[in-house]
Amino acid sequence: MKKIIVMMSLLLLFVVSCGSSKEFSIDVDGKGKVPNFEIKDLNGKTIESGKILNNGKKTLFIVAAEWCPHCKEEMPEVQKFYDANKDKVNVVVVFTNNQSSLGKVQTYVKNNQYTFPIYYDESGAIARGFNVTGFPFNVKINNEKVEETLELPVDFDSLTASFAK
């Protein structure tokens, strides 16, 4: 019996370590510093977040779910904002694995023809790191710090006003 418990513990440890990304935590309300973390695009390419968040531009950072009605409402507005501001503002949309899959997200993005940068939170580490409790989750990041949590729902005009500050 003791051997079975040890084997099960080792198996659980192995599964958890293989499937998890490096964990982090950000004090979003306290406008915390955003640490560097790994993020995957929809093709499975791993990118260091610093390369997309710390390039001298403010960043609209969204954690969303393809099944979320409010996210579906916001995404066309985000696309419009991206088209008008892509040279001045980073737009980073991270779709969660919560009740979803990479395939579902890829299909959703393709069907809606979104062209802004899209990533997939395979392990849920990004949603946990930003302490996301609901979708969509929208923040403005500037100089590696959370500058503002954006009120929901966001639209083109509210995004334009927020990033004009």
PLM regions: where:
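Structural microenvironment flanking redox-active thiols in thiol-disulfide oxidoreductases
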Residues: 72-111, 125-128
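Short active-site neighborhood of thiol/selenol oxidoreductases, capturing the structured segment around
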Residues: 49-72, 92
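Short, small/polar residue-rich loop motifs at catalytic or cofactor-binding pockets
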Residues: 33, 57, 133-134
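Thiol/disulfide oxidoreductase modules built on the thioredoxin-like
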Residues: 110-114, 122-164
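Positively charged n-region of N-terminal signal peptides that target proteins for export
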Residues: 1-4
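C-terminal motif of bacterial Sec signal peptides marking the signal peptidase cleavage site
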Residues: 14-17
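N-terminal "domain-start" segment that seeds a small globular fold
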Residues: 19-51
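Loop/turn elements at helix/coil->beta-strand transitions in domains of secreted/extracellular proteins
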Residues: 56-59, 87-90, 115-116, 143
